[in-house]
């Protein structure tokens, strides 16, 4: 079945699962006894061990690093958290700043053909640009050297976003070739360490450097505003240059193109966004090795409710993959592996981003990414800025009141346990009894079964679990994650099997040593699922 699955589902995963995706379950060495609920189950989960529906890419658990996180290599507390999390892949340098980042430049030494002022398409004031430099070794930035050191410390690989904007705003006679050459030199410097490369970040956006240029400074006849067609044409120049560099050093690399993730049909979405994908494929054809999409799931800067947030995790993820398939067919191009290189929520006003609800959302997203056969994903981001609780960062960068620097937010715990308890193959599953309960079932190459159950309802449920065509071992293990009673429905705290944080936000300090609850499988598997909770279940196999 493994071979068949590889063949059938290769299109949206491709080279992201080309290496062996074996995964051995980490069976807990100690546990606390779990007394199964005595009442009749209200929800039934049935999975089929023999029916594998997808390979789980190990690159779904990624995250984003960025220069303004500061020199994190010198922060042992954070590095230890990242090691435990084991994100597998970390993206760099951004984010929006990718298009104003010069990987080989010393501080304040931008190339001479870069203007002091960069134009954008939004309403920001025109002022000298803040550029970023890969050789800035100051304590307040993450240099390229220290990014590579972070990857080594976290036992993760990289995905690098090169500066595409430079091809637009550069003042040289041949700005596209100059920018492509700079990117190719990075590939040479990288020496094969990084296999995945992105050509720019959200280049269709008014907020990007390169969206609008001063045509009086341009010397190769480029238009004032970018289009998908122009990006496609210039993408091919980058791809040719970068792949030539990779061949020189004998490296295998894959190059991604920036695409729009869903159909843009709203009145305020402009012609550039609406025509982006069609324009790109018109000039680039099948030149991209993978498709890059971003999603922030919830309505932009709206005070969304918990139910709204949790519902987007399934709806939007499924919508993205369906759109990638339809869009490829409509444009008569090959469907390529799909990489969600930024994702989070846009909900603001009630500290939603740092809440346990955001953690639950992440658990659902990971389950949907696996089920819908995404090749790769990296959440935005490791650290950002508190901004009154509107903070995408997984860790406190140091400005959250009453909380130590690098304290993990609840989402850290939800993503940690997901990777710990979810195997390397998706198996089919069905839920009956309540439509607020979701189940993501899997198996490990070492034989065990792992499930992630999400109760996104406001009522307690008793869930029975049955795995067909599976011979269980003696025990199953359980981690239940719940929120606290602070901040309305957006608690900033998470509890693991009842163990909680010592600070106003985050979770228990001893994540690596928290014992699971455990019971014998002799009487079947039945667990209690509190309102707004996630259960991570690991079931031993018969030896």
What are these regions (language model features)?
Residues 11-286:
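N-terminal catalytic cores of secreted or lumenal carbohydrate-active enzymes
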Residues 68-72, 97-101, 167-169, 204-207, ...:
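Flexible loop/turn segments at secondary-structure boundaries
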Residues 435-474, 478-486, 532-538:
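Carbohydrate-binding surface patches
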Residues 472-525, 529:
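Acidic, Ser/Thr/Pro-rich beta/coil linker or hinge segments at domain junctions
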